[in-house]
Amino acid sequence: MAIYRNRISPIKPTDAVDYKDIDLLRKFITEQGKILPKRSTGLTSKQQKKLTKAIKQARILSLLPFLNKD
């Protein structure tokens, strides 16, 4: 029998995910600039989709890099 536990989402459902909030977006990307998967961030599917769109929009507007060259 599988045991499921409720996870607390790191982003509150009332909080808006915005492409201009770079500090929040940086928490959900790796050092190489890749978007972290839902299973490691603990977000809901809806929040993950909004986060992904916000990160991609921030990349296009040059607020976030596509790749980190370190």
UniProtKB/Swiss-Prot annotation:
This is Small ribosomal subunit protein bS18c. The gene is rps18. GO terms for molecular function: small ribosomal subunit rRNA binding; structural constituent of ribosome. NCBIfam families: S18. Keywords: Chloroplast, Plastid, Ribonucleoprotein, Ribosomal protein, RNA-binding, rRNA-binding. GO terms for biological process: translation. Pfam families: Ribosomal_S18. The keyword Plastid applies. Gene3D superfamilies: Ribosomal protein S18. GO terms for cellular component: chloroplast; mitochondrial small ribosomal subunit. Belongs to the bacterial ribosomal protein bS18 family. It is found in: Plastid, Chloroplast. Its main location: plastid. Part of the 30S ribosomal subunit.
